[in-house]
Amino acid sequence: MSLFAGRPIKRLSLLARGGVGLAVAEFLASRRGLEVVSYQATDLAPRLRRLFPRAKAVKDPTTAAYAAHLRRDADCVFSAHCAVVLPPRVLDATPHPINLHPGYLPWGRGYWPTYWAIADRSPAGCTLHRMVALVDKGEIIARKRVPVLPTDDGQTLTARVAKAEAVLVREMWADLASGRYPTFRPREKGTYHDRAEGLSARRLKGSTRMTARQFTDLARAFTDTRFDGMSVDGVYLRLSLHEAKK
């Protein structure tokens, strides 16, 4: 464990998406002494415009122009479910490149960490970490474990992890804002899954060989009413999970 010591975070650029991104944005809007100077123009753009009327909307946070904006105007770039991998020129433009990740790092690096926590039977949770060029490999600031219940599917676990993410940001904000916060590198190897692996795992062939437990874990991991879920030979399925009556 070490202490990262940089200048206080008084001006912040927010890259936020989805429900967790909105929760983070609303929390940051309530912080005295913090100015959100820009935000990514994602699905949240109309709401972020109302929360931060003086901030500029950024279409592409990978450009040299955005990096120059950060060097000039921001102490921190804060990512909350941003779907873009930021290049080194952006990560190096502020002393505090911070990401909120819906996985208990080093497990769940990459795409769909809550789903893979079920499929892999690996730890689930959320993590605040410093961003580096390698995806989800930066030093960990703080993390919060979320138990995987026997009746969880991908959607229910994702919802509980989202609540934990909002709590983690609130708990750690005073340290982050001061510019002085603990960091550490995990000793465990953890897991990584890219997008292609997730898409492939959701499209099984009838000839695929696996145990009943592996099939059940994979099916419930990708059970989520927000998309089609897992399929076998083109037939989609979702599991309905409940504990046995005693």
Residue spans for each PLM region:
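One-carbon transfer enzymes
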Residues: 1-246
